[in-house]
Amino acid sequence: MPRGLELLIAQTILQGFDAQYGRFLEVTSGAQQRFEQADWHAVQQAMKSRIHLYDHHVGLVVEQLRCITDGKSTDADFLLRVKEHYTRLLPDYPRFEIAESFFNSVYCRLFDHRSLTPERLFIFSSQPERRFRTIPRPLAKDFFPDHGWEPLLMRILSDLPLRLPWQNKSRDIRYIIAHLTETLGEDALPRCHVQVANELFYRNKAAWLVGKLTTPDGTLPFLLPIHRTDEGELFVDTCLTTTAEASIVFGFARSYFMVYAPLLAALVEWLREILPGKTTAELYMAIGCQKHAKTESYREYLCYLAESDEKFIEAPGIRGMVMLVFTLPGFDRVFKIIKDKFAPQKEMSAAHVRACYQLVKEHDRVGRMADTQEFENFVLDKRQIDPALMALLRQEVPEKITDLGEHIVIRHLYIERRMVPLNIWLEQVEGQQLRDAIEEYGNAIRQLAAANIFPGDMLFKNFGVTRHGRVVFYDYDEICYMTEVNFRDIPPARYPEDELASEPWYSVSPGDVFPEEFRHWLCADPRIGPLFEEMHADLFRADYWRALQTRIKEGHVEDVYAYRRRQRFSVRYGAISSTANSS
């Protein structure tokens, strides 16, 4: 190879990343217009397009590099010099951390995910931890109640870049003050102030104002979801001021925010204070940088592994028919491998399962489907694998394992947030907790269906419970669009003997679903059945599902709230609006 080629390749990779991130910002910058125009289908399409940008640009760079090297193979020393040159480009580069992930992706694409060593890749960052750079403008603006909270909030709402009129700004300000007074107390409120991010966070049908509320006792989140009416007027739907509420808003089961952030690292650092329970990976994931989030997730895994003497074990719960799932006992994630052979009743291919996981990645997850990271050639130390799990791996996924002596390499797997399987949770809880779990399960089904997702297999074992008590779906092999399903009523029996027969007395075609049958496995437990009938009996009616299909086909996009209905201002303070004047 000619001398100097290493630098050219390093520069080409970095320029390719610049192009990718420029397009990322371009798509993101359209979020305000899509919100103002209520173009909700464009919102969904932009979300998918932005996810695809990264892999598309990695592919473009790989093709450029093959042209530059004339398709010739490169030796290890050459690649090390490329990385050295690339590293030298990063100290003055503002998005160094994502640029390192982009380099990793290009390398993996070129070498088919082989030889993934710290010498060749940025397994850990080459730059100082949490490195800051001079930024062209502050990320946020401070507001102090020098003349009271009403003028303070008026300034905040009036400073927003949104160009739509307000339905009733004064009313919304009173709602916010009422909430803050209830939360903090009337005496503490004058001693508090707010710092608000300059950019709005857009997702689904809302524009989120994200801020920090500084109180005498510490800093709290200050989140205002701003919606628009069908008439094009703005209103604040609620105010959220606890870290638990903020954690749910930025949760792993939700779509990525669109927030214009030329310097994502600075924004991540700013968010840490109000999201103390979120890891670096989760913060990057929440704001749409999912590929770098994968890098950070892998780093978090390596750090945990280095400090733990735990062994990998099969994950608790009912063993799956499609996926083999394992975990570390104290780690908050699980590892999922597609089995080489499925149970007979699972008539599908591994390619179909991977397509289902990709569908979830690109779709609006409405807070009810767990996000995943996909890995290839994942290395495990045999000494850290429990013998029972090793035997299971050899039995269920031998075609996906390469034995390297002291290590094994798993050809393909997913990493996903660990939750308590819902069936186990239901066995352990009673009273109000049981009631809440059944309510959550039904709400999860409804919200998925409204987002055009039919889970397929609705058994409790396919759902998990998060640390906040939310029910989330995580078994995707039978997932499909609602519009692909034929929801049918079971025809009346012709004779009494029909109901006792082993075969149905009516025809069943592929895609047919009979909601009446859900009752048999969802209500079998006498503790659960009455609760389900009380709260979710309509899920057993085919006409309920057909009505949802009609709304979807008509183009209706449902509202998705990252908080309970009872937290909405219209529910809490509805009476106030009758005397409020529009502004």
Curated annotation (Swiss-Prot):
Protein origin, superkingdom: Bacteria
One of the record's GO molecular function terms: protein serine/threonine kinase activity
EC numbers, comma separated: 2.7.11.5, 3.1.3.-
Keyword Lipid metabolism among record annotations: no
Catalytic machinery residues: 371
Any one GO cellular component localisation term in the record: cytoplasm
Subcellular compartments: Cytoplasm
Keyword field: ATP-binding, Cytoplasm, Glyoxylate bypass, Hydrolase, Kinase, Nucleotide-binding, Protein phosphatase, Serine/threonine-protein kinase, Transferase, Tricarboxylic acid cycle
Main location, first listed in the record: cytoplasm
Record GO biological process: glucose metabolic process; glyoxylate cycle; tricarboxylic acid cycle
Amino-acid biosynthesis recorded as keyword: no
Known function: Bifunctional enzyme which can phosphorylate or dephosphorylate isocitrate dehydrogenase (IDH) on a specific serine residue. This is a regulatory mechanism which enables bacteria to bypass the Krebs cycle via the glyoxylate shunt in response to the source of carbon. When bacteria are grown on glucose, IDH is fully active and unphosphorylated, but when grown on acetate or ethanol, the activity of IDH declines drastically concomitant with its phosphorylation.
Cross-referenced HAMAP family: AceK
The protein's name: Isocitrate dehydrogenase kinase/phosphatase
Taxonomic source organism: Salmonella gallinarum (strain 287/91 / NCTC 13346)
